[in-house]
Amino acid sequence: MNRFLVAAFWCLVGAAGFAQDARQIVSESQDRSRSRSQRYEGTLEVIGSSTKVSLKRWTYERIGAFGASKSILRFSAPPEVKGVALLIVNHTDRASDQWMWTPAIERDRRIALQDRSTRFFGTDFSFEDLEERDVNQYDFKVLGDETVDGAACWKIESKPKESKSSQYTSSVLAIRKDNYVTAQIESFVKDKLVRRIRYSDIEKIDNIWTPRTVEVFDVGRNSRTVLKLEKLQYNTPMKDEDFTIEALRRG
C-alpha cells in the first residue's frame, strides 16, 4: 500500500484517510498470518540486568483466529514451574479472559484485568502481552517510516478504544512493507516507553511468514526474554474442548 499521496489530496481528506490506511495495513498483516490453529514448543532465556540467565520451556497451542481464539500455554521446564499453565480466551469486543493453573497447590485462578501488567512467571512478558486482540478494538495512525533489522517498515501508532482494557496507553508498531510481518512493537504508558518486542528470524511456514525469535525488553527492569519457537505447526486438527478450565487442570 502506497501512503505517499499528493499533498493536495491530504488537504481534502484530512486525518481520516490517514487512519484508514493505517487500519488497512494492520488488517492485512493479521490476514496474512491467519490460521485455524497453531502449535509450537518454545525455549526462553530470561536475562536479567546482572546478565544472570535462567532457562525455561513451554508449549503453546491455539485454536481460532484473531479476536476469537483460545490458547493454552504450559511450562515444561524447569521443575519448579513445570505444569504451570495459562488459558486465554480472546474476544472480539473486549479484553480476554485468563485463568492460570498452578499444579503445586492444585489451584486455578482468574487473572483480573488490573493484574495483567505483571510479569508472567519470571519472564519479561506481561499477561497482556500473551493475548491476541482484534483490530476493531484499536484506533490506528500512520506516523511515518522506519527501518528495523534492515527492513523498511510502516510506523503505526495503536491506541485502545477502551482505555481500561489495556495497561498501555499506546503502542507503536513497525510492520514490514515486503511481507506485512510485524517487526517490532514498542508499548508506552503515558508517553513513557515500558516494553519493546522485536520479531526476527522470519521463515515461511505453511505459507505463513513467521518470526522464529521473539525478544522482549522490559525497559524499567533492564531485562529481556528471548523466545525461540521450535516444532511450529499451523492448521493441525484441534478440539475446542481442549481449551477449557477442565483441560487446563488436566495438563
Regions found by a protein language model. Name each.
Residues 10-18:
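Hydrophobic h-region of N-terminal signal peptides that target proteins for export
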Residues 1-8:
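Bacterial N-terminal signal peptides that target proteins for export
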Residues 19, 27, 87-89, 97-101, ...:
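Gly/Pro-enriched, hydrophobic low-complexity segments
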Residues 52-55, 130-142, 193-196:
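A short, amphipathic edge element
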Residues 21-104, 141:
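N-terminal mature ectodomain segment of secretory-pathway/periplasmic proteins
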